[in-house]
Curated annotation (Swiss-Prot):
GN (gene name): mdtL
GO molecular function: transmembrane transporter activity
Subcellular location: Cell inner membrane
GTP-binding listed as a keyword: no
Entry membrane topology: Multi-pass membrane protein
Gene3D superfamilies: Multidrug resistance protein D
GO cellular component: plasma membrane
Protein family according to the UniProt entry: Belongs to the major facilitator superfamily. DHA1 family. MdtL (TC 2.A.1.2.22) subfamily.
PANTHER family to which the protein is assigned, alphabetical: MAJOR FACILITATOR SUPERFAMILY MULTIDRUG TRANSPORTER MFSC
Record's keyword terms, sorted: Cell inner membrane, Cell membrane, Membrane, Transmembrane, Transmembrane helix, Transport
Organism: Salmonella agona (strain SL483)
Name of the protein: Multidrug resistance protein MdtL
Top-level taxon of the source organism: Bacteria
Length: 395
């Protein structure tokens, strides 16, 4: 079991590392490529577009050919794309590399969740996904620090050499440590129950959890996207104050994420999901009524706590009905989360909604819709029946 957890954690970490590692070198990258920082900020959107593109195909391929081949290819693509970025001499080549980085990270991301669905029952999976969320929260804090230390002695290209090395490590883990977990053939009496046709992506329960997780990701990405404006322009924080504040909010996320597995031993998953949405609603009301920086910071802290306590549980429930189509389900969740959050941020920008109102709107909207879905669509018996699925154990 340890090998599956190690490989899943490593596969997921490529995604946030690809976002955060290079940001500290953005001014130098822009200068060397004769591009403005504003032009290169599109690299974030290009990276997400690459992830979404990979997710369209990676899940289905993983269900048909296995998790291991997709993990190896994804890590290889991430490694080569990182080298392409390091060799870029102009903006378009750099953006091409960023797109391919997203493709590699997206494939690995999908496989990681499929592996956890294959190897863990719902109770353990919810705990592991909460821990995974906490570990992921470390990356946005550590990656810029590591990038800064690297750039004290080396050029910006070294940031992408580092990411390339990460791709190599993940590829080696996938090649030599990871074992295939794609479900083995089922007994004839189980085929009708667990066939791809029965594991529909349009069943009410999956759609409800897809909506909840997509709205939750929209909340946290809106917070990340709006935080520079809120903290430095509206609240008057310096760059140093901003970095400290974001580190503290990431610390809150880690503490809550690492505490959630223990909470699952005391409370039902539904209770934690309701607590999560209650925290979102409280954060939205707090921010709308805040007149001091202290109250605003309290509201922002509630956002991080709310996301950390409920997201892993909701993701675990979303994957629960799927045994033979875990890859496709994971892909669908990833695409919805990336595209849904990007659409909200884009629409808010087009409509001229302020950063604070953008955040308040998604907080209140997410909490109300999610609470209604939690009460109206509960896990049914068939979800539990899909949990115990034998998997292949081939190296």
């Amino acid at each position: 079991m340890k090998r599956f957890l190690l490989c899943s954690f490593a596969l997921v970490l490529l995604y946030p590392a690809g976002i955060d590692m290079y940001l500290v070198g953005l001014p130098r990258i822009a200068a060397d490529l004769n591009a403005s920082e504003a032009q290169l900020h599109i690299a974030f959107s290009v990276y997400l577009a690459g992830m979404a593109t990979a997710m369209l195909f990676a899940g289905k391929i993983a269900d048909q050919s296995g998790r291991k081949p997709v993990a190896i290819v994804g890590a290889l693509v991430f490694m080569m794309a990182s080298l392409l970025c390091s060799r870029a001499s102009e903006g378009s080549l750099f953006l091409s590399g960023r797109f391919l980085q997203g493709v590699g990270a997206g494939g690995c991301y999908v496989v990681a969740f499929a592996i956890l669905r294959d190897t863990l029952d719902e109770h353990r999976r919810a705990k592991v996904l909460s821990l995974l969320n906490g570990i992921t929260c470390i990356v946005p804090v550590l990656a810029p620090v590591v990038g800064h230390l690297i750039m004290l002695r080396f050029p910006w290209q070294s940031l992408f050499y580092t990411m390339s090395a990460m791709g190599i490590i993940v590829g080696l883990l996938s090649l030599f440590i990871l074992r295939e977990t794609r479900p083995a053939r089922l007994a004839p009496r189980d085929l009708s129950r667990s066939s791809p046709a029965a594991e529909s992506l349009v069943n009410r329960f999956f759609v409800s959890r897809l909506a909840i997780t997509t709205l939750s990701v929209s909340v946290i990405l809106t917070f990340v996207n709006a935080s520079p404006v809120l903290l430095m322009e509206v609240m008057g924080f310096s760059r140093g104050d901003y970095a400290i504040t974001m580190a503290l909010t990431a610390g809150v996320s880690m503490v809550v994420s690492f505490s959630t597995p223990f909470a699952l031993g005391l409370f039902k998953p539904r209770t934690l999901m309701l607590v999560s949405q209650g925290l979102f609603l409280t954060a939205g009301v707090t921010l709308s009524l805040a007149h001091t920086n202290t109250v605003t910071l309290f509201g922002l802290t509630l956002i991080c706590a709310g996301f950390s306590v409920g997201f892993g549980v909701a993701m675990s429930q979303a994957l629960g009905p799927f045994s033979l189509r875990a890859g496709v389900a994971s892909s669908t969740l990833g695409i919805a989360q990336v595209c849904g959050s990007s659409l909200w941020i884009w629409l808010a920008a087009i409509l001229g909604i302020s950063a604070m109102n953008m955040l308040i709107g998604i907080l209140i909207g997410c909490s109300i819709v999610s609470i209604l879905l939690i009460f109206s669509v509960a896990p049914n018996r068939s979800v539990a029946e899909h949990e115990e699925i034998p998997y292949q154990s081939r190296s």
